[in-house]
């Protein structure tokens, strides 16, 4: 049986793979697993549920809430809010679990469901596996009468509570900084502009009018050209681009150059080390991070630890080691002293705070890391399980590694959310990286 959970919860085409019935069963099973140790006679368990603005979110939220209520869990619906806001509110309200209905950067027809445990923490694989097992055996019946959970619609203070948290996490004034923020017509559309303005920045929001159908539609962190053009048009100091659920942030400097998650981590790591905030002088990233990040950190006396791709694995390493900064090249940046998951708005505030602290432009700050040319090709495949061990692929990988030696690297890995294999090559020149990646991708495509 194929595993239901991917690298970031359950995700798929809404009303086909991710149906209301599946959401109902997931809600019931997750309620059983995540609240089994927190039940008492004095109160019912509580779940916080938020979503992004895509049209299927309302349907899935209703089904999911019904499933949890059927197992005796009170459901606090907080409406459209970023994923990190739901994680924070799960902890703030003392809830037993949290749920986000979002497919992040995926197209509007997709959706997803991801869970948080008590305290706002993402689930380890073992707990997700337990939820899947319970889904197969959970009975139709449940509590009756007073034992049935209530569904409380739209907690009125949820957004304001999250905004206060952001202000407290990054209190430095951003007065004098002009920022363009691309909200992807997603969960950041209200929160991000409000947070940046409250910190003192002049904010120029774009793609901040969600209508249930336009999330990630030629905008946001996967369409960085939109914020690049707006920064140049308005003469802004920088631009920030969020994804649909606002757990990631990419940046653009005043000249329109992209500053990706690796560069953002380099900037923040150096700042935190200087200020005595980088615990154990260690940064946590993934195997997809550019080789240039490792070289820059080595020069600064900072250890770089790498994990599998997925911010959940970065989080596990951060928690296990007691570290204070980690993230992904894609813009998922985690600051454990201020949150339990990647937070795009917090990242944007932290980046601008460093600009305000130093008086330096984003371009100058980003120059602390030299980015090695990198090419990434996504190859559609029918069976992800056979690719890496196929003799033709093994031989092609060996040829590429022999050619690059210590001057680059090759990485081949399956997507955790789509039927794709990702071919990534770093090399001294873009041309070399592109050629080697294309050769390897052609081999994978024939399998």
From Swiss-Prot:
Known EC number: 5.4.2.10
Organism: Corynebacterium diphtheriae (strain ATCC 700971 / NCTC 13129 / Biotype gravis)
PTM text: Activated by phosphorylation.
Gene: glmM
One of the GO biological process terms: UDP-N-acetylglucosamine biosynthetic process
Binding, Mg(2+): 104, 243, 245, 247
Function: Catalyzes the conversion of glucosamine-6-phosphate to glucosamine-1-phosphate.
Domain of life: Bacteria
Names of the cofactor(s): Mg(2+)
Keywords recorded for this protein, A-Z: Isomerase, Magnesium, Metal-binding, Phosphoprotein
Positions bearing Phosphoserine: 104
Reaction(s) catalysed by this chain's protein: alpha-D-glucosamine 1-phosphate = D-glucosamine 6-phosphate
Protein name according to UniProt: Phosphoglucosamine mutase
Active site, renumbered: 104 (phosphoserine intermediate)
């Amino acid at each position: 049986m194929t595993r239901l959970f991917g690298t970031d919860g359950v995700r798929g085409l809404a009303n086909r793979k991710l149906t209301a019935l599946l959401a109902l069963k997931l809600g019931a099973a997750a309620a059983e697993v995540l609240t089994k140790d927190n039940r008492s006679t004095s109160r019912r368990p509580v779940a916080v549920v938020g979503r992004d603005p895509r049209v299927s979110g309302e349907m899935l939220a209703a089904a999911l809430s019904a499933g949890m209520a059927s197992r005796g869990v009170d459901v606090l619906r907080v409406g459209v809010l970023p994923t990190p806001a739901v994680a924070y509110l799960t902890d703030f309200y003392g809830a037993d679990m949290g749920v986000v209905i979002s497919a992040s950067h995926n197209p509007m027809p997709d959706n997803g469901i991801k869970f948080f445990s008590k305290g706002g923490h993402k689930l380890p694989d073992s707990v997700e596996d337990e939820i899947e097992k319970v889904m197969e055996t959970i009975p139709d019946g449940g509590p009756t009468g007073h034992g049935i959970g209530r569904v409380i619609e739209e907690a009125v203070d949820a957004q304001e509570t999250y905004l206060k948290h952001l202000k407290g996490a990054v209190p430095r004034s951003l007065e004098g900084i002009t920022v363009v923020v691309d909200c992807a017509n997603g969960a950041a559309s209200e929160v991000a502009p409000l947070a940046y303005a409250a910190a003192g920045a002049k904010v120029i929001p774009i793609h901040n009018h969600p209508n249930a159908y336009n999330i990630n539609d030629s905008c946001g962190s996967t369409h960085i050209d939109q914020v690049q053009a707006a920064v140049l048009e308005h003469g802004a100091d920088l631009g920030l681009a969020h994804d649909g659920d606002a757990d990631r942030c990419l940046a653009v400097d005043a000249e329109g150059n992209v500053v990706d998650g690796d560069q953002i981590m380099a900037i923040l790591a150096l700042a935190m080390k200087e200020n005595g905030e980088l615990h154990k002088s260690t940064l946590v990233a993934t195997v997809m991070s550019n080789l240039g990040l490792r070289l820059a950190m080595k020069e600064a006396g900072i250890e770089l630890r790498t994990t599998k791709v997925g911010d959940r694995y970065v989080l596990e390493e951060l928690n296990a080691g007691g570290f204070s900064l980690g993230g992904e090249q894609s813009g998922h940046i985690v600051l454990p002293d201020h949150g339990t998951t990647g937070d795009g708005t917090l990242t944007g505030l932290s980046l601008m705070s460093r600009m305000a602290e130093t008086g330096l432009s984003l371009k100058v700050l980003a120059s602390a890391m030299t980015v090695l040319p990198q090419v990434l090709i996504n190859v559609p495949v029918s069976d992800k399980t056979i690719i890496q061990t196929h003799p033709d692929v093994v031989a092609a990988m060996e040829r590429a590694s022999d050619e690059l030696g210590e001057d680059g690297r090759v990485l081949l890995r399956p997507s955790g959310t789509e039927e794709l294999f990702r071919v990534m090559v770093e090399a001294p020149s873009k041309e070399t990286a592109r050629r080697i990646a294309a050769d390897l991708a052609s081999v994978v495509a024939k399998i």
